[in-house]
């Protein structure tokens, strides 16, 4: 009985730690997302009207593709990842419940969103060079 209580307390403590680690990572990714969207907008604003017209269709298609790609990528279960692919907060995944798994999906989406947006900024900066 005492062992079970101790085990449950450890389990709860590990879950709280996992949640804290996830909250910290969410804050970082959300801050990155704000910056990267701002940079993308600035990059776009630097184009002439003519350049914007040339790129408009491509840009619209890119937004859609980024969204779909990231939704697919974010559905990959942490259990399908190798240790080297896992972020620090994911190494506690054995203590996750459904809510934490759902939150991980959101984080993976944001991470992908940021990465693809950064790649797009690089592309746009070179498109007319």
Residue ranges of predicted features:
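N-terminal alpha-helical modules
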Residues: 1-129
């Amino acid at each position: 009985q005492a062992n079970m209580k101790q085990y449950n307390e450890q389990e709860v403590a590990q879950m709280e730690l996992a949640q804290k680690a996830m909250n910290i990572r969410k804050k970082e990714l959300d801050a990155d997302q704000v910056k990267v969207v701002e940079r993308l907008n600035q990059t776009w604003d630097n184009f002439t009207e003519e350049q914007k017209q040339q790129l408009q269709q491509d840009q619209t298609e890119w937004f859609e593709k980024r969204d779909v790609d990231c939704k697919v990528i974010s559905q990959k279960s942490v259990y399908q990842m190798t240790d080297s692919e896992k972020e620090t907060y994911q190494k506690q995944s054995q203590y996750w419940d459904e809510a934490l798994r759902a939150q991980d999906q959101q984080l993976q989406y944001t991470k992908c969103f940021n990465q693809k947006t950064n790649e797009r900024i690089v592309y746009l900066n070179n498109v007319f060079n």
